[in-house]
Every structure is written in C-alpha cells, then in structure tokens.
Amino acid sequence: ISAQENMPIILSDSENGTEVADNFIDSKDIAKSYVIGGTYSISNSVERSLPNATRIAGSSRSETNAKIIEEFYKDTDIKNIYVTKDGTKNKNDLIDSLAVGVLAAKNSSPIVLAGNKLDTTQKDVLNTKIIDKVTQIGGLGNENVVEDILDIQEETKYTVETIDELNAAIKRADANDIIKFKP
C-alpha cells in the first residue's frame, strides 16, 4: 500500500524509535502516519512522536493483515489478491511479500499474509469483497489459503418472502451473494 499511496515506510528501533528518520519526517512535511503493528512491535512513545498517527494492529500478524486490507481496500471489487506466506514458520518466507509488493501496488491489489489457513478476521474481511483473481506467490505451504479464498467467493442465492426472511438473509449474505425478495 505504501507504493500505491506514495507513502514512505519508516522503520523504528525498539530503543531509539524513529530517531534516524526524524529529519526525513520533518523535511517531507508528513501530515499523516500509520503505525503498523501492536505495541510489542512499535511502542506508544514512537506512535506519539509521529504526525497524526493511526495504529493498525491486531492480536496476530494475520489479524493485522486483515485490518490493513479493511483500512486501505475499501472498494468491494478487487482485481487480484496475492497470497504469500506469513513468515511464522520461517521469517525468510516474508521475502515473497516484499517481492510482490511493487506488482500489488501497480494493480491496486492487497497481499494476504497467511500460513496454512486463513485467520477468522481475514475470512471476515475477504467475505466482503468480490475478487476477480487469486494469485499464490512463492513456494508451497499456503495452498489451503488459496482454496479458502476461492470458497469464500462462491455465490449463494437467497429467495425470501417476508421482511424477517430478508433481514436474516442480509445478515448471512456476503458481497458475492444474491437476495431475491418475492413478497
């Protein structure tokens, strides 16, 4: 998202925060900051030192990923989703996410970080999207995630006759479903 929105990525140090980048931040007159990750990764003091900071964090890497998709990909229609390993088994697996980042930015498409299955929060946010294409990046290890995303995209048709049935169908339906109201 940083390349897509022309936002620099500033890395922070657990002891010195963004000290090495403070001159850059001041010189670029940055008006808005996003802190990605919880307080274990980036302290509250670092967050407070940044201009107009908003923290995007979950209880896990997968939940943080879901919140990033929710925050920066508001449209229902998504051209492509790139699925990469989340680095929990091997931190070197995260290189796939970095490698596909430029392509994802060019296509305005999110990256889904996942192990061998989607997190519930990832499923919830992807359930609100209509995804044209799912692309697995890197080697084996997250094929189940690709299948899960494709399953989420299946269309369900509801035919309802009463307002109560309509309300129930609306609660169950996702972005790919069709509800026919025949009173």
Residue ranges and their predicted role:
Residues 156-182:
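Acidic Gly/Asp/Thr-rich repetitive segments characteristic of extracellular carbohydrate-active
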Residues 1-156:
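Extracellular glycan-binding segments that recognize GlcNAc-based cell-wall polysaccharides
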